């Protein structure tokens, strides 16, 4: 499947509140989000699944692929388009064996060494970061900066998405590293109008 990585939204139900969660995602999709990741760190498996069913319907309505964060089992149960795993999750090669060759497999990296490992082990794309300090992830590592992001992109043949602290104010300089897209949370979901926020980011990326 051809994937547009340019504006990759990672969800945060705690940030927007359960009541406004689906509406915020709909507005973000209306604004031009090209890839969606469902990330649920604070819920049990059943609740995650129930939320996932609704989010998958929304993503399908807009023709946007749905990626599940970490939970390979739920990605399969939901028949999502793919799964994104990090350094502390199941080994990448094992995840690829489980999900098969056709699902999208994303991998979080913070160095060229990790990126090369991801490429060898069967990742379809890399999420590199955090590029800048971020408040959206409590467990975020130290920021890697633009130079290292550029190094990662230059060192692999896979699509690379910049993650962490990216928003309207710095998107242009991030794009100049040559990466294929940006992953955001608060730059869309913390804004008063997620649709307008997404449109603004799309315009910055394309122009």
Swiss-Prot record:
GO terms for molecular function: magnesium ion binding; thiamine-phosphate diphosphorylase activity. Signal peptide: none annotated. Its cofactor is Mg(2+). It is an enzyme of class 2 (transferase). 4-amino-2-methyl-5-(diphosphooxymethyl)pyrimidine binds at residues 37-41, 69, 108, 137. Its EC number is 2.5.1.3. 2-[(2R,5Z)-2-carboxy-4-methylthiazol-5(2H)-ylidene]ethyl phosphate binds at residues 134-136, 165, 185-186. It holds the Pfam family TMP-TENI. Pathway: Cofactor biosynthesis; thiamine diphosphate biosynthesis; thiamine phosphate from 4-amino-2-methyl-5-diphosphomethylpyrimidine and 4-methyl-5-(2-phosphoethyl)-thiazole: step 1/1. One of its GO terms (biological process) is thiamine biosynthetic process. Condenses 4-methyl-5-(beta-hydroxyethyl)thiazole monophosphate (THZ-P) and 2-methyl-4-amino-5-hydroxymethyl pyrimidine pyrophosphate (HMP-PP) to form thiamine monophosphate (TMP). This is Thiamine-phosphate synthase.
């Amino acid at each position: 499947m051809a994937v547009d990585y340019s504006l990759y939204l990672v969800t945060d139900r705690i940030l927007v509140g359960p009541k406004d969660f689906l509406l915020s995602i709909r507005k973000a999709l209306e604004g031009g989000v090209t890839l969606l990741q469902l990330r649920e760190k604070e819920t049990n498996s059943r609740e995650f699944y129930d939320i996932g069913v609704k989010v998958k319907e929304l993503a399908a309505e807009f023709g946007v692929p749905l990626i599940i964060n970490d939970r390979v089992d739920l990605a399969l149960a939901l028949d999502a388009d793919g799964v994104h795993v990090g350094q502390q999750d199941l080994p990448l090669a094992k995840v690829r064996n489980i999900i098969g060759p056709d699902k999208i497999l994303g991998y979080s990296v913070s160095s060229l060494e990790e990126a090369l490992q991801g490429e060898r082990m069967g990742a379809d794309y890399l999420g590199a970061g955090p590029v800048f300090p971020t408040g959206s992830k409590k467990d975020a590592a130290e920021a890697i900066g633009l130079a290292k992001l550029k190094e990662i992109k230059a060192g692999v043949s896979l699509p690379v998405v910049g993650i962490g602290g990216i928003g309207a104010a710095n998107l242009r300089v991030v794009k100049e590293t040559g990466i294929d897209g940006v992953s955001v949370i608060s730059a869309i979901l913390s804004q008063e109008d997620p649709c307008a926020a997404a449109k603004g980011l799309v315009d910055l990326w394309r122009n």
